[in-house]
Amino acid sequence: PEVLPETADFLRLLREQTERMTQMTKTLLEMSELKTVPCTDRIELAPMVEEIFADLAPLADRNCIILESEGDGVMIGSDTLIYRMLFNLTENSIRYNRPNGTVRIMITDEKNRLVIRVTDTGCGIPEKYRESIFQPFFRVDKSRSRENGGVGLGLSLVWEIVALHGGEVLIEESSEKGTTVAVKLPTDMKTKLL
């Protein structure tokens, strides 16, 4: 039997909303279980960044985004959570970038802290939203976010993961030429506990 165009549109919308709700539920469950995850893995960041770039290559290629990385560092923490944090930051930088833009991850060791800077060439984040973007469900541009998928929890999850590791995350720089998000993490759990 043929489906009427209105019915097909309704079914497509229903499927999209179901997928969005499923993703939101999964993310909320992840956030509620963060504190139970052991943070005892030895993590080499450069290979992890390369893995994230490989995982996000189809999205970057679709948007004509160049992925670059520089530096390395080793830390103690949850391999799974640090991967998720870097993945979310990189994915956002790709999704909200300009066509033919660049996403660059730079890792430096500064006074027993690893500083990971994720820089893009997107349109920037208005100053009044730079702290709010780490709150659950916050979106700078609600219509654009819906086009790009997601449920408004990615950066909130980033903030939670960084806090769990004794670090901080902030918008270091943002203008119409792009944004740099800086994540500062202790290199070991002893530093976290001080």
Question: Language-model segments: which ranges?
Answer:
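Short helix-loop "hinge" at the ATP-lid/N-box region of the Bergerat-fold HATPase_c
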Residues: 93-94
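Short conserved segment of the HATPase_c
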Residues: 125-139
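Acidic ATP/Mg2+-coordinating residue in the GHKL
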Residues: 120
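Conserved micro-motifs of the catalytic ATP-binding
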Residues: 2, 30, 34-41, 74-80
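A conserved beta-strand-to-alpha-helix junction within the catalytic ATP-binding
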Residues: 41-54
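Conserved glycine-rich
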Residues: 166-167
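Short alpha-helical segment of the dimerization/phosphotransfer core of two-component systems
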Residues: 13-21
